[in-house]
Amino acid sequence: CRNGGHFLRILPDGTVDGTKDRSDQHIQLQLSAESIGEVYIKSTETGQFLAMDTDGLLYGSQTPNEECLFLERIEENHYNTYTSKKYAEKNWFVGLKKNGSSKLGP
């Protein structure tokens, strides 16, 4: 979960962003498979699940729901990409901007 040197993190208030700090306790994420190619991404520090809402905004959810399930794909360049399963028709990816803020799905 890196982009431009940023690690994806889920903060206690549900904010999702990126940090360059490797020692930040909120970058520790656990992936768990729901089925082949479908994963939940959970912060081991806050216990929150990564989620994407109807507008493509990333947030942390205390409980897993439809917005927390992502389709995982290994690309030709060997990077993993994650798209919202619920909004798959919109082709929204999990992403960070170069400044570390979360990028809207579209």
Swiss-Prot record:
Return the GO cellular component terms, semicolon-separated.
cell cortex; cytosol; extracellular region; extracellular space; nucleus
What does the record give under GO molecular function? fibroblast growth factor receptor binding; growth factor activity; heparin binding; integrin binding; S100 protein binding
The record's keywords, sorted A to Z, are: Angiogenesis, Cytoplasm, Developmental protein, Differentiation, Growth factor, Heparin-binding, Mitogen, Nucleus, Phosphoprotein, Secreted
Name the chain's protein. Fibroblast growth factor 1
Per its database record, what is this protein's job? Plays an important role in the regulation of cell survival, cell division, angiogenesis, cell differentiation and cell migration. Functions as a potent mitogen in vitro. Acts as a ligand for FGFR1 and integrins. Binds to FGFR1 in the presence of heparin leading to FGFR1 dimerization and activation via sequential autophosphorylation on tyrosine residues which act as docking sites for interacting proteins, leading to the activation of several signaling cascades. Binds to integrin ITGAV:ITGB3.
GO terms for biological process, alphabetical:
activation of protein kinase B activity; angiogenesis; branch elongation involved in ureteric bud branching; cell differentiation; cellular response to heat; fibroblast growth factor receptor signaling pathway; mesonephric epithelium development; positive regulation of angiogenesis
Binding-site list for heparin: 83-86
Task: Quote the InterPro entries the UniProt record gives.
Answer: Fibroblast_GF_fam (IPR002209), IL1/FGF (IPR008996)
Q: Which organism is it from?
A: Capreolus capreolus
The PTM entry states:
In the nucleus, phosphorylated by PKC/PRKCD.
Keyword Cytoplasm assigned:
yes
Superkingdom of origin organism: Eukaryota
Give its localization: Secreted; Cytoplasm; Cytoplasm, Cell cortex; Cytoplasm, Cytosol
Subunit structure and binding partners: Monomer. Homodimer. Interacts with FGFR1, FGFR2, FGFR3 and FGFR4. Affinity between fibroblast growth factors (FGFs) and their receptors is increased by heparan sulfate glycosaminoglycans that function as coreceptors. Found in a complex with FGFBP1, FGF1 and FGF2. Interacts with FGFBP1. Part of a Cu(2+)-dependent multiprotein aggregate containing FGF1, S100A13 and SYT1. Interacts with SYT1. Interacts with S100A13. Interacts with LRRC59. Interacts with CSNKA, CSNKB and FIBP. While binding with LRRC59, CSNKA and FIBP seem mutually exclusive, CSNKB and FIBP may cooperatively interact with FGF1.
By its UniProt entry, which PANTHER family does this protein fall under? FIBROBLAST GROWTH FACTOR
Q: Tell me, what's a Pfam family for it? A: FGF
What does the sequence similarity comment in the record state about its family? Belongs to the heparin-binding growth factors family.
